Amino acid sequence: MSTEEKALNFIEQIIEEDLKNGLSATKLRFRFPPEPNGYLHIGHASAIALNFGLGIDYNAPVNLRFDDTNPAKEEQEFVDAIKRDVEWLGYHWSEERYASDYFQQLYDWTIEFIKKGKAYVDSQSSEEMAIQKGTPSTAGTDSPFRNRSVEENLDLFQRMKAGEFEEGTHILRSKIDMKSTNMLMRDPIMYRILHKHHHRTGDQWCIYPMYDWAHGESDYLEQISHSFCTLEFLPHRELYDWFLDQIYDSNLVRPKQREFARRNLSHTVVSKRKLLQLVKENHVKGWDDPRMSTISGLRRRGYTPASLRNFANTTGIAKRDNLIDVSVLEFCIREDLNKTAPRVMAVLDPVKLVITNYPTGKEEWLDAENNQEDENAGFRKIPFSRELYIEREDFLEEAPAKFFRLSIDKEVRLKNGYIVKGESVIKNSVGIITEIHATYDTESLSGSGTEASQRKVSGTLHWVSVAHAIEAEVRLYDRLFLDEAPDSHKEKDFLEFVNPDSLSVVTGFVEPSLKTAQNEDKFQFQRLGYFTVDKDSSSERLVFNKTVGLKDAWEEKGKKEENSLNNSLKEINKFFKVDSDAERNEVENLIKESIQAVANFSLLQNVLKKNIANNKSSLLFANFMLKHSSQITPKDFDEETIQKLYTMSLRSESPFVRIEAIRNLQKDVFSLNALGTFLENLKATEKDEKVKELLLSV
């Protein structure tokens, strides 16, 4: 690998250092080792890009190894899906391997462990073993079965293999150090009994190796030079090395485990358990639901292999876990589709536009550029006629000055077509506009070169011809979770943050060029965003998934929410300046509206914490947030934080702050009890009559 082309990340630096220290480049070998118990997600895509990318950079083989050591959760369906996803991402493995390929070798090594006194059969219950193992701050104690004889251990282990015992009656543990500061080194489990059918080995085995025993040894058997995994496996490295020490042949390559940070993506979850929960509880429609963080879900939504590879490269490799905003991923797909997606016209909330001076029965086929970013994309023909569909939001009967779309007596251009002027409307019995009537400038055809065609008007609208439009189902997807880190709040179930509006389905109309569109074909619906043909499409009905908007609507929403809270904090000062209760209520109601308009839990939580300060305005605002927000409660904060808010507020110079703190405390029984002595002391010293009256009622 050329080190001059780019700065090396710390993973590449490790490899380069090993090469300098004598490791032959021909000995480099990497692997991607998924467990086939679910579908791959965006986090796996980054690990895939890392390992296969290293294989490409160093011209080294990369194995795809399935860590299939738990038949209770693993299925062939997941094996097939993983292979499909890796290939779709554009990567090719050198060898397809399975941990189950090595079951016999692992068993043989284990027999040697037992013979050397390095492993024993433990017959404790899981509860007994948990107590005996100790805690991070207290040493463990030896199992009462730790000193079984070699003969007894061999007999029991072979009988475990023969299927004589029920699950949970015995396990095999390695004999290491029950006083180790690393809990994983306190005689870790090597084998457990599982009477489950294995998707590859059938019922041949009923004892299965644990991850820590199988993983490093699989690396060793495959002669993997570098075993890269995420940071949660850092404590496992000591055990990884200990197991290798017992079997290592100095004539062979010794694998090296090193760790990198997990990429957590905002507004989603990547835990397989939580993804499975979303599927099983019908919050989504399967593993490939376009709202899921699975690769199959992202693919169905319209993400491309190039966009996911670019995302992995853009976010890079880090040593600390970090939260990547989903807008980075959305930027990557916009960048890709902007270059490759044909531009077409579709109307998703249609209202009929009738051009009254356009001849009845006439139609024109106009030239439309397929993609201005690709000079080779060419042009297509689109039909223009007297009756068109436009977006309902693109017309206002009475429009403000800065409305740059169609209205009465106002001109706009129809994309690739003519300039039209709004004249009148037809409404139904309840006042909803059903038709907009307009006239067109006959000399204003776009691209005709006439003086009229070059006139500047306030805006350009997309449209489709009513007579030629194809009806389509359009699925408008939004972020699955309202909170940026839904599973990071100990006090909350992540499902509480599921976005109830993450999917809306509309019937729209698309131009006729899309009649032959196939599954996974991608388009830019002009002015609306990027859309992908869904697998549910048929010859009778097209179905499109919204991949991503042309702009990040959530960024705008986030800024609005943040600005709303900041402006409310400024309003708080007025509360202290006005004289009457009525005026204070008016100020509080304005602040209340701003607080209740914010749905972002993390934003609310962080802003409240920041306002626990020795400042009456900040403290009053924090109490108002607790009082008026439907998103946060005292239970969403740790005990120390919430009690700090109360105690600082109750000591505030402002009686208004003290009053709001007491009102919040009245609804927070836990904190009320915890601060009982503090409140009793305040009752004796409080001088403000209103505050004292409230205190006495507590």
Regions found by a protein language model. Give the residues of each.
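N-terminal catalytic cores of NTP/NDP-binding nucleotidyl/phosphoryl-transfer enzymes
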Residues: 6-83, 199-230
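Active-site cores that bind ATP or allylic diphosphates and position pyrophosphate for catalysis
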Residues: 64, 68-70, 76, 98, ...
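A glycine-rich helix N-cap at a beta->alpha junction
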Residues: 78-102, 110, 119
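Substrate/cofactor-recognition hotspot
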Residues: 311-575
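Alpha-solenoid HEAT/Armadillo-like helical repeat scaffolds in large eukaryotic proteins
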Residues: 571-578, 606-612, 644-651, 678-686
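Alpha-helix N-cap/helix-start positions at coil->helix boundaries
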Residues: 580-584, 613-619, 655-656, 685-690
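Alpha-solenoid helical repeat scaffolds
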Residues: 586-589, 620-624, 644, 660, ...
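Alpha-helix capping and inter-helical loop/turn segments
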Residues: 593-603, 612-613, 627-641, 653, ...
